[in-house]
Amino acid sequence: MRQHHHPMALFFTLMLGLGVAQQGIAHSGPPVPDPMNIEGISNAFGWDFEGTEIVTEKVTDSLYVLFGVGGNIAVSVGEDGVLIVDDQFPQMMDRINAAIGELGGGAVDFAINTHWHFDHADGNLALGPAGTWLVSQANSREKMLTDQVINLVGVAYAQEAYPHEALPVITFEDAMQFHINGEQVDLMHFGEAHTTGDTAVIFRGSNAVHLGDVYNNAGYPFIDAGNGGTLDGVIKFCKQTLAQIDETTIVIPGHGPISDYQGLSDYIAMLTDIRDQMMEMIEAGASLEDVLSSDITAAYDETRGDPGLLLNRGYFSLTHKVVDR
């Protein structure tokens, strides 16, 4: 399958680089950098809302993935309407709608948020008022009700409470189904992982799954430990998703190029290996600084990039020493 450079790879490269510079601060001083607003975070990471075009990749005749600024968007288009998974930013919505129109779709009928983070759900601010039915796992909607801080270690983002019209109007606890465009779409929640409100969206007819940021294919994953995410949970969530699919399933990550069953399997093996080595160090009394200076990710750094953010947030999730919740 064709793969292309994903603009969010730059985001993770910059974020991880900033994170390494701040590791000591995160451990021994103020745990959260001064939170930025959307203008600050977009400037810090070089996001170009005006200049970034939407790139479309076909999965099946009725399922596509849109790449732009923010999380990958899955688009189901057919006789029943348009269902999307994640919606990026309102600044991108005209181009997102145009891309959907080129696929033969009209207005977005349903938008599923894989979780509540701004780069996957801020598009709600445009879609909700336009009449789109917004959907999420119940914990994600709960997070959207109030102001949140997302600690990315080197930087932090101040995510404001969503207005009423941008909140999910349909929520679920563990599972729900759509029957749309000739296929069954399963929404499944397997507990805390990247956040406490993650959703795997499985398109049964297309044999594809969108995992949101539980599966990051642009670098190491970010564990939002400050808001209840855990490294153990990411591994569990991915394993339970793997049990729902087969070896020919297309796997859509939250960021990075489209992947497959083997890619997700390798991701699970990598995180399990890192987690096990980290736990061995923790049980021997290792500090965060010990973990950060170790070589437990050396086998993966060449392809995944800087591990600092994963190690920091993973350490705190495994030791339950999260200092910024």
Give the ranges of each region predicted by the language model.
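Active-site metal-binding motif and surrounding structural segment of the metallo-beta-lactamase
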Residues: T56, E79-L83, Q91-V135
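Metallo-beta-lactamase
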Residues: K58, G81-V82, F89-Q91, R141-A193, R204-G205, C238, ...
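Zn-dependent metallo-beta-lactamase
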Residues: Q23-D80
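Bacterial N-terminal signal peptides that target proteins for export
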Residues: M1-F11
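Conserved beta-strand hairpin/beta-sheet module of binuclear metal-dependent hydrolase folds
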Residues: V55-A99, V201-F203, A208-D213
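Accessory terminal helices/loops
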Residues: M15, G19-Q22, H27-F45, A243-E247, ...
